[in-house]
């Protein structure tokens, strides 16, 4: 049977791939094949649709690739979880639904790199707005008619949220009313990708539901990509598996690789693009020796600081089996109640030292004491702060183990490999204890359950981090944008040295952003979609944004930053 032809083949129906599939098929004469190794996102599967059930997909393999790292040398040689989404929606189908864009200086930092000058925050902000419909309405920072439904936290959901934010302010840190607005730094309510009727707002819902009826879009699920086909240095198509059958599809224009920070470098390497020595070790014909493929891997590591709650206001009763049917019925029939929230409704970003130019620590507050993946629940009323560093200098890698497309790659993050990692985690634990000790939490705060008040010395804190810190599920940067020797793609996602091939997902970030990665991944896909379509970029924003400029980390005064005329004159 002759191979079918499409203008574009997209590998991976995740946070980025669904954006591209939707935007490219807005042009009716463009045909797109969207390949997804997982299955559909079933609308009536509470595990992926109910926000409060966010831990369930991580406990199985229907929606989770369930990768595992190699023994991490600085973490007691633990093999650590690396959950990634499998199915329409990708990781937006199983993530924690925290809508955090990152700090303005993340993007300004990207733009300081040669060739990435049009990735400033003010260049990116219009694409964040384009993607978003925020329930509180549009403004200079937020959109009102985009595919991603964003819900703001409402007062009165749980007294612990407001108390934890107030405790951060009492400890001397700023208050912010919008972690995605003028000022990220500080404590405040957290936006979430949840619809108005209490359902998860994955990209399969927001984007793909628009595009699915279009005759120029073909979606194939349970399609595991084997390799990208090349004619010389030009990508010409894809070989994928349907059961045991190998199927070939050809791309007239481009192949768009959107498989995430683990699978994108894995597929490139299996296709003959990557470090030449690695490829030759597996007898893979080298299409292009590109040393950065799979390198520069980054993630956020975090700890759970858990406390007993003296008042019965936590979510502990919701963990009891006898209470769950009523929660599920209310959510199913009304879209309200405990089931309709991811319960990460407050958080914050702080600088631990005055010389940090922008926040280096993130907080997620949760009114229950439990691991992110639903394990190790404390059998009492409790609450916790997830706390972790944002820009670790440690770097890892993704390396192919075999030519078998069903075998997971070798993954090593090298967590906590640098001295700065240890300093920031020690600071974070001690600062968190100061915050929790504030008067706002007096009526709720019981004993410290984890790490435990007896752990005070650097050595004790370090031992706790080695044994208990976990991934925040933010792998990124393994096919980095740029023009240095280790860069994989240019500023439009085009793979250096090849034609007809782009990578568009979190792997192309040159440096991890400050916070959760779903919103930045959607933004960069929106931005690159315009370039693929040959459309003029959206006009650069002129919205001001906060920069600390050396202000004290505690008690800092606001300093507005707007583009200087010379910066504003830059064009894409």
From Swiss-Prot:
One of its GO terms (biological process) is glycine betaine biosynthetic process from choline. The gene is betA. The keyword Flavoprotein applies. Keywords: FAD, Flavoprotein, NAD, Oxidoreductase. GO terms for molecular function: betaine-aldehyde dehydrogenase (NAD+) activity; choline dehydrogenase activity; flavin adenine dinucleotide binding. Its cofactor is FAD. Belongs to the GMC oxidoreductase family. Pathway: Amine and polyamine biosynthesis; betaine biosynthesis via choline pathway; betaine aldehyde from choline (cytochrome c reductase route): step 1/1. This is Oxygen-dependent choline dehydrogenase. It catalyses: choline + A = betaine aldehyde + AH2; betaine aldehyde + NAD(+) + H2O = glycine betaine + NADH + 2 H(+).
């Amino acid at each position: 049977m002759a191979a079918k032809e499409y203008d574009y083949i997209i590998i991976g129906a995740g946070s980025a791939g669904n954006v591209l599939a939707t935007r490219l098929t807005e042009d009716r004469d463009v045909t797109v094949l969207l390949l997804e190794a997982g299955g559909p996102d079933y609308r009536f599967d509470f595990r992926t649709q109910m926000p409060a059930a966010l831990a369930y997909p991580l406990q199985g393999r229907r929606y989770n690739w369930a990768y595992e790292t190699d023994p991490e040398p600085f973490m007691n040689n633990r093999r650590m979880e690396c959950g990634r989404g499998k199915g329409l929606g990708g990781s937006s189908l199983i993530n924690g639904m925290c809508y955090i864009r990152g700090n303005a200086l993340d993007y300004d930092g990207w733009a300081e790199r040669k060739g990435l000058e049009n990735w400033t925050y003010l260049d990116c902000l219009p694409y964040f707005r384009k993607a978003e419909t925020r329930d509180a309405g549009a403004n200079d920072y937020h959109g009102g008619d985009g595919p991603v439904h964003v819900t703001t936290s409402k007062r009165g959901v749980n007294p612990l949220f407001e108390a934890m934010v107030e405790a951060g302010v009492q400890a001397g840190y700023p208050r912010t009313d919008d972690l995605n607005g003028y000022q990220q730094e500080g404590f405040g309510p957290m936006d979430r990708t949840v619809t108005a009727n209490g359902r998860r707002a994955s990209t399969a819902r927001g984007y793909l539901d628009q595009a699915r009826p279009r005759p120029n879009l073909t979606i194939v699920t349970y399609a595991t990509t084997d390799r990208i086909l090349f004619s010389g240095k030009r990508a010409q198509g894809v070989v994928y598996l349907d059961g045991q059958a190998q199927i070939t599809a050809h791309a007239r224009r481009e192949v768009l690789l959107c498989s995430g920070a683990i699978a994108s470098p894995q597929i490139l390497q299996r296709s003959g693009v990557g470090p030449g020595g690695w490829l030759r070790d597996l007898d893979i014909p080298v299409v292009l020796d590109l040393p950065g493929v799979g390198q520069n891997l980054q993630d956020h590591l975090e700890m759970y600081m858990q406390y007993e709650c003296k008042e019965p206001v936590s979510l502990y009763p919701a963990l009891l089996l006898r209470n769950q049917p009523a929660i599920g019925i209310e959510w199913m029939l009304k879209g309200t109640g405990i089931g309709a929230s991811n319960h990460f409704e407050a958080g914050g970003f702080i600088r631990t030292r005055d010389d940090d130019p922008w926040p280096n620590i993130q907080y997620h507050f949760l009114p229950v004491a439990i691991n992110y993946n639903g394990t190790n629940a404390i059998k009492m009323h409790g609450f916790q702060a997830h706390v972790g560093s944002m820009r670790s200098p440690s770097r890892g890698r993704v390396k192919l183990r075999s030519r078998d497309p069903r075998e997971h790659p070798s993954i090593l993050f090298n967590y906590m490999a640098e001295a700065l990692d240890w300093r920031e985690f020690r600071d974070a634990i001690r600062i968190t204890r100061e915050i929790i000790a504030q008067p706002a939490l007096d009526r709720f705060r019981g004993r410290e359950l984890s790490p435990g008040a007896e752990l005070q010395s650097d050595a004790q804190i370090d031992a706790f981090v080695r044994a208990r810190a976990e991934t925040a599920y933010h792998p990124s940067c393994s096919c980095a944008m740029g023009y240095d020797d280790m860069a994989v793609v240019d500023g439009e996602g085009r793979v250096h040295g090849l034609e007809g091939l782009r990578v568009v997902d979190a792997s192309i970030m040159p440096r991890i952003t400050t916070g959760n990665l779903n919103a930045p991944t959607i933004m960069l896909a929106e931005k690159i979609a315009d370039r693929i379509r040959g459309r003029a970029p959206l006009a650069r924003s002129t919205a001001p944004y906060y920069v600390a400029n050396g202000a004290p980390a505690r008690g800092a005064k606001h300093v507005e930053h707007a583009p200087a005329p010379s910066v504003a004159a830059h064009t894409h």
